[in-house]
């Protein structure tokens, strides 16, 4: 037989079926917390400690502007100015900005404190300064209207507020300044003439000739004296550099480089008349060493080396050589595979790229 008896089970509280405990909301918890701290009895403070009741400012010093009643509103920063204490703003500074305009008078009952409100509502529909159909209600409003009229004459309000044509105002100011200084408005065509490029048929001025290189202008635009001086040349300088051009010996000594700061010439660029070029320079010698004399023939598909640019006309060239060559449109640049095939003994072939 079992002598230990039944096994003791822990104590379990029997649960009631069908009842779920609801958790309080935050509002209920806060209400219970604040309600516990609230004093049991609320005593009113004594009359001496109470603040004087706030009395609205008298409606006599408040002016309702026209911006609330009509479209001719000139407000500040596009905000509607509904009321303005003109007497306080135009005073000599006796009132402190933080102090109220009128001393606060305590009223025995709150009903009397609300009496000025309907009065101010009645005056909202009145035009300031007594300019309405009826006479002004008080002499202070007429005085405020007089102050507003004087202020408007001093400030010139139509020019100090928006809805203006700024471009027209700026143009009028410029025209008035020119008329006051010079007596008339100058012709804009004469002013803008210096900003426009010169006409192709006109001769450039002295300043334009100094700034513009000679190869930009055509031989017709070069002055006659400079053209003759450049064509004659000088024999003061000699160059011991060996000649590599195809000019005859008799013609080499007659031509010399010009005195002006002209860029070096390029005799390697083929020209029909080789007798028109001057003596070679060190740059020509380097080009004769490094550059190929004859370019390779073009391929059947029309890809070849870029053609050399035609040499611009200069004062040293005779008129016949200028008419010999004709400019042609630039040819397309050769492809990379063609350049590699020309410089390598073996033909380079690249397989087509596959996109994955």
UniProtKB/Swiss-Prot annotation:
Ranges annotated as biased composition (Polar residues): 1-12
Annotated compartments: Nucleus; Chromosome
GO aspect biological process, one term: meiotic cell cycle
Biased composition (Basic residues): 19-29
Cellular component terms per the entry's GO annotation: chromosome; nucleus
InterPro entries associated with the record: Pro-rich_19
Membrane-crossing residue ranges in chain numbering: none
Keywords, in A-Z order: Chromosome, Meiosis, Nucleus
Family matches, as Pfam families: Pro-rich_19
Region: Disordered, residue numbers: 1-53, 95-143, 216-255, 312-331
Principal location listed in the UniProt entry: nucleus
Source superkingdom: Eukaryota
Functional summary from the UniProt entry: Promotes meiotic crossing over formation through its interaction with CNTD1 by participating in the crossover differentiation step of crossover-specific recombination intermediates.
Complex and partners: Interacts with CNTD1.
Protein name (record): Proline-rich protein 19
Gene name, Swiss-Prot/TrEMBL: PRR19
């Amino acid at each position: 037989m079992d002598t230990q008896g039944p096994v003791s089970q822990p104590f379990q509280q029997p649960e009631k079926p069908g009842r779920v405990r609801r958790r309080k909301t935050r509002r209920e918890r806060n209400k219970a917390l604040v309600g516990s701290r609230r004093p049991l009895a609320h005593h009113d403070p004594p009359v001496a400690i109470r603040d004087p009741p706030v009395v609205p400012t008298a409606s006599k010093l408040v002016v309702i502007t026209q911006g609330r009643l009509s479209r001719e509103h000139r407000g500040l920063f596009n905000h509607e100015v509904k009321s303005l204490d003109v007497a306080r703003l135009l005073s000599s500074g006796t009132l402190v900005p933080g102090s109220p305009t009128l001393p606060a008078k305590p009223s025995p009952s709150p009903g009397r404190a609300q009496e000025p409100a309907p009065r101010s509502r009645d005056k909202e529909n009145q035009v300031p300064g007594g300019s309405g159909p009826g006479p002004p209600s008080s002499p202070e409003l007429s005085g405020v209207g007089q102050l507003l009229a004087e202020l408007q004459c001093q400030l010139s309000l139509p020019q100090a507020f928006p809805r203006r044509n700024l471009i027209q105002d700026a143009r009028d100011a410029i025209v008035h300044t020119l008329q006051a200084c010079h007596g008339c408005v100058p012709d804009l065509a004469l002013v803008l003439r210096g900003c426009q490029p010169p006409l192709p048929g006109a001769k450039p001025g002295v300043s334009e000739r100094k700034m513009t290189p000679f190869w930009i202008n055509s031989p017709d635009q070069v002055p006659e004296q400079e053209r003759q001086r450049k064509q004659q040349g000088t024999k003061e300088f000699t160059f011991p550099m060996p000649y590599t051009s195809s000019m005859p010996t008799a013609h080499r000594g007659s031509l010399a480089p010009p005195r002006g700061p002209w860029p070096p010439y390029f005799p390697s660029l083929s020209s029909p008349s080789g007798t028109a070029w001057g003596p070679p320079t060190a740059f020509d010698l380097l080009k004769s060493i490094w550059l190929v004399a004859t370019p390779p023939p073009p391929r059947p598909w029309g890809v070849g080396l870029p053609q050399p640019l035609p040499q611009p006309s200069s004062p040293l060239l005779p008129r016949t050589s200028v008419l010999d060559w004709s400019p042609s449109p630039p040819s397309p640049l050769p492809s990379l595979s063609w350049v590699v095939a020309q410089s390598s003994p073996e033909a380079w072939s690249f397989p087509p790229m596959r996109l994955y």
